[in-house]
């Protein structure tokens, strides 16, 4: 697990994720041409009650899940 601290909605928070999830988030932010913090903010604002780490994992899985 890798723990990172960031500011969301004016509050400092820490998130622990596996390195592969951090790498996927960084890759997605780079593809979109936005900062990692901006991507995490978008996911945070869209989540429906899940804790932030879970919401980030679900977002990553959604990007990499095969579509049929």
Feature locations, PLM:
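Residues in the helix-turn-helix
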Residues: 14, 38, 55
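Aromatic side chains
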Residues: 11, 21-22, 64
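C-terminal structural segments of small proteins and small subunits
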Residues: 45-68
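Residues at secondary-structure transition points
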Residues: 12, 16, 34, 47-51
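Surface-exposed, Lys/Arg-rich phosphate-binding patches that contact polyanionic backbones
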Residues: 20-45
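Short Lys/Arg-rich basic patches
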Residues: 1-16, 26
